[in-house]
Amino acid sequence: MRLIDTHSHIYDADFDSDIQEVIDRATDNGVIKILLPNVDSESIKPMMNLAEKFDFLYPMMGLHPTSIKEDWENELSVVKNHLFSQSDKFCAVGEIGIDLYWDKTFVEEQMEAFKAQMMWGFDLGLPVSVHNRKGFDEMFAVLKSLNRPSYNGVLHCFGGDLRQAEKLIEMGFLIGIGGVVTFKNAHLAELIKSISLDKIVLETDAPYLAPVPFRGKRNESGYVLYIAEMISRIKGVTLEEVAERTTLAALNLFPRIA
C-alpha cells in the first residue's frame, strides 16, 4: 500500500526534536511521498533544509493568505524570487489562496496576491495548492478574472459544500481531504460519498487538524493512514483502493514527484 501526504508542514519547529521518528512512523504507515507547502519568507529556510535531508519530501513555494499583512508586497517578492530562481526545486505553487476566517482587513491584497501566484503557476507549468477559509466567493471571483478554460491544482483541506466541490472539479481542481473527515461531520461524509476517488487527494496539514484518535494533539504525516481508512469506510471500498486511486491522483496532479 502506498500513500501520499499532499500537504504537511513537518518542517515546523514543533517537529525539531523528533523529526526522524516522525519520518519513520510515516514510512511505516505506507507514506511514500510528503509535500511541503510554504507559508512565508521565514518558513523557506526550514522547509528547504528538511527537503534536502529526505529525498521523498517535495517543497512548494507560495505565500499563505494569512501572511498577507502590511508588508505583503515584500513577502510576495521574496517568494517570487525563490520560485523563479529555483523553479526546478518546487513541485507546486503553494500554499496560496484566500482566508477571511479571522480577519478581512487585507481581503483586496489577498485577492491580488492569489491572482499573481495563480499566474506564476501558469507561467511555470506548475500546479497550485489552494487554501480557502470563508472566502469562496472571493476565490471564484479571482479564478473567473483569470479567464482560463481549466486549472491544475488542489483545494487543500476542503471545507466547502458539494456544489462548490463540483464546480471546482469541473474547473480542473482536485479536492484535498484531511483529518476533519474523521470528526463527527456528516456534511463532509456525504460530500465524499458523492465525489469520485479519482478527484480526491489525501493530506494531513500537520501539525494541525490531527485525525481521530489523535484529535487535539500534534498531527503528523503518518496519520494520513487514518484519513484513508475513514474514506474507505465512508465510500464502502477497501483501504487499498483508496490508497491506490488517491496516490495515482496525486502523482498525476504533481508530475514532479512522480
Could you say what each language-model-derived stretch is?
Residues M1-A258:
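Mid-domain alpha/beta scaffold segments of enzyme catalytic cores
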